[in-house]
Amino acid sequence: MFRIVNGEDYSPAVQQRNSLDFGKAPSLLWTDHGGSNDRCETGGNGRESGQDRVKRPMNAFIVWSRDQRRKVALENPQMQNSEISKRLGYDWKMLTEAEKQPFFEEAQRLRAMHRDKYPGYKYRPRRKAKRSQKLLPADSSVLCSRMHIEETLYPFTYKDGCAKATRSRMESRLSRSQPTNTTSSLLPQEHRSSWTSLSHNRVT
């Protein structure tokens, strides 16, 4: 079931040593597959340094994908790591249960050895840092302030609780500015008529 390929020993004993020495040789394992959830874990409160962290034991997919990933990467040097992961995930699903069985057995053996070596180990997934501010659809105060600035320049669609107040404020402002606008619009006409009459008197 396990053989030497390209000068590398893939026996169960060597694989176990590689899995437990992951911190010393991280290139031996590939754990970036989205479905594997094989992330760095700790046996304590999650605040230990990188050297004290205990890795999860490899699952069947990781046991299988180590050699396959190296093979695909050599055959397709231009392929991105994410694309390799997608391809490996698809190929793994295409395997029959009989083909997967040896890797499940090896993963079970690795879990037993991991349990003996770290009896107090508990899986603690890392939590993503919460965003300080959640993205919400148009806050009322922000919307009102934007409308207050832009209401005289751009047409605006009113939303939320500030719509009525802003509309009434705009109407009152327009009603106050309308006479001024009318007067200002008449001034150029009166000025032109006065200039025309003055020019006519000079000619006559």
Curated annotation (Swiss-Prot):
Coarse class of the protein's main subcellular location: nucleus
Family stated for the protein in its record: Belongs to the SRY family.
Keywords noted in UniProt: Acetylation, Activator, Calmodulin-binding, Cytoplasm, Differentiation, DNA-binding, Nucleus, Repressor, Sexual differentiation, Transcription, Transcription regulation
Polar residues: bias regions: 175-187, 194-204
Pfam family, one: HMG_box
Cellular component aspect of the GO annotation: cytoplasm; nuclear speck; nucleus
Record has Hydrolase as a keyword: no
PROSITE patterns the UniProt entry points to: HMG_BOX_2
The species this protein was found in: Balaenoptera physalus (Fin whale)
Name of this protein: Sex-determining region Y protein
Assembly mode: Interacts with CALM, EP300, HDAC3, KPNB1, ZNF208 isoform KRAB-O, PARP1, SLC9A3R2 and WT1. The interaction with EP300 modulates its DNA-binding activity. The interaction with KPNB1 is sensitive to dissociation by Ran in the GTP-bound form. Interaction with PARP1 impaired its DNA-binding activity.
MF annotations from Gene Ontology: calmodulin binding; DNA-binding transcription activator activity, RNA polymerase II-specific; RNA polymerase II cis-regulatory region sequence-specific DNA binding
Region of interest (Disordered), residue spans: 32-52, 169-204
Localization (cell): Nucleus speckle; Cytoplasm; Nucleus
Function noted in UniProt: Transcriptional regulator that controls a genetic switch in male development. It is necessary and sufficient for initiating male sex determination by directing the development of supporting cell precursors (pre-Sertoli cells) as Sertoli rather than granulosa cells. Involved in different aspects of gene regulation including promoter activation or repression. Binds to the DNA consensus sequence 5'-[AT]AACAA[AT]-3'. SRY HMG box recognizes DNA by partial intercalation in the minor groove and promotes DNA bending. Also involved in pre-mRNA splicing.
Post-translational events: Acetylation of Lys-130 contributes to its nuclear localization and enhances its interaction with KPNB1. Deacetylated by HDAC3.
DNA-binding region(s), residue ranges: 54-122
GO biological process, one term: sex differentiation
